[in-house]
């Protein structure tokens, strides 16, 4: 009788051990980068900023852009940054920006931020775009700037017109 009781207790203990290791969390793991391709990495001394889009490139016209900030020391992606950006076109005699949205975090627990930029002009041999990204993490301010490729699009993707109020619209 003792032998059978020991076997039964051992079996129950093993069953409880396996049962307690199971997970009731049936929510699927979300891949933040699904359908996105990396465009470029912009670096400074502390972080690497990864730019993404659906096509993996920027072009003249409307561009929906996502980004992630990676800490160079820990290798972790930042989840609590406040991000702003400023695209600048450097021409022979002047510099100008273009229409852009704010940069917003996509999900509370995620690492991806997104916004859009409408490049009104394409780059050429002497004129180019750069993207300055200003961001704050836990009260500390950081900046990273890099030249970006903005070739002409195959089709017209942006147009401007003057409204009845004499304001120009894109």
Where are these regions (language model features)?
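Bacterial Sec-dependent N-terminal signal peptides
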Residues: 2-44
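First exposed extracellular module after export/assembly in secreted or surface-exposed proteins
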Residues: 32-170
């Amino acid at each position: 009788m003792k032998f059978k009781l020991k076997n039964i207790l051992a079996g129950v203990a093993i069953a409880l051990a396996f049962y307690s290791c199971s997970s009731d969390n049936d929510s699927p793991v979300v891949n933040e980068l699904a359908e996105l391709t990396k465009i470029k990495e912009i670096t400074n001394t502390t972080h690497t900023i990864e730019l993404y889009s659906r096509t993996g490139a920027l072009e003249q016209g409307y561009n929906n852009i996502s980004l992630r900030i990676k800490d160079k020391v820990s290798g972790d992606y930042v989840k609590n940054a406040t991000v702003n950006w400023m695209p600048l076109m450097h021409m022979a005699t002047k510099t100008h920006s273009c229409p852009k949205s704010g940069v917003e975090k996509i999900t509370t627990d995620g690492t991806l931020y997104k916004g859009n930029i409408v490049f009104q002009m394409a780059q050429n041999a002497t004129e180019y775009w750069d993207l300055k990204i200003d961001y704050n993490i836990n009260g500390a301010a950081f900046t990273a700037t890099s030249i970006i490729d903005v070739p002409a699009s195959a089709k017209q993707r942006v147009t401007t017109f003057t409204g009845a109020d004499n304001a120009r619209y894109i």
